[in-house]
């Protein structure tokens, strides 16, 4: 809900000419305006200017693709009191370059626009760990790996796979709880892995991560999945 004492400021911005409004001090300007991206979910974040508490301000968000001259309003974040705005649907092409910008307004005053650095989802998004499912088959383990789902859709209407955009290497580790020993059981591109040679009457946990050779970076590790070998 927009604060009542800010409604006047919003109306003035929308209805008055630029010459009728005096820009606010620099301290009203939104700070640290940046995209934060995880699995191609692209969220614009910012901090309130130093002269106003965040709950006394309203914010206006615009975005554009690199090379475009016209900024587009983000309707859902036009006059918002939040310090973030989901621009996933406006930045769906992972290879394109985008900008976002934010302005603050309250009680007839407004700040200048603060623009993000150039943002490329493919380059900057962070990856979650793969989803891991394990099944015991006698004295061995079958491990199934699934990369995180993306908001992007393929031609059949299904969520695109992370493997559509990156060459991914999966790393699987086993932890022998009795010996408190970890070892790498697999590294490769397959999503179905058989782990053999396990010690009977022992408990094992399995974790996995994804590695991007092109960027030399890896995801966090998955949650442990544990099983007892009879």
UniProtKB/Swiss-Prot annotation:
Keywords: Disulfide bond, Receptor, Repeat, Secreted, Signal. It is found in: Secreted. Transmembrane segments: none annotated. Residues 29-128, 129-230 form the Fibronectin type-III domain. One of its GO terms (biological process) is negative regulation of inflammatory response. GO terms for molecular function: interleukin-22 binding; interleukin-22 receptor activity. Residues 1-20 form the signal peptide. It comes from the Eukaryota. Highly expressed in lymph nodes and at lower levels in lung, spleen, and thymus. Not expressed in kidney, liver and heart. InterPro entries: FN3_dom, FN3_sf, Ig-like_fold, Interferon/interleukin_rcp_dom, Type-II_Cytokine-TF_Rcpt. Disulfide bonds join 77-85, 205-226. Changing residue 66 to A: Abolishes IL22-binding. The record marks 66, 118 as: Critical for IL22-binding. GO terms for cellular component: cytosol; extracellular region. Its main location: secreted. Pfam families: Interfer-bind, Tissue_fac. Belongs to the type II cytokine receptor family. Receptor for IL22. Binds to IL22, prevents interaction with the functional IL-22R complex and blocks the activity of IL22 (in vitro). May play an important role as an IL22 antagonist in the regulation of inflammatory responses. PANTHER family: INTERFERON/INTERLEUKIN RECEPTOR, INTERLEUKIN-22 RECEPTOR SUBUNIT ALPHA-2. This is Interleukin-22 receptor subunit alpha-2. The lineage of its organism: Eukaryota, Metazoa, Chordata, Craniata, Vertebrata.
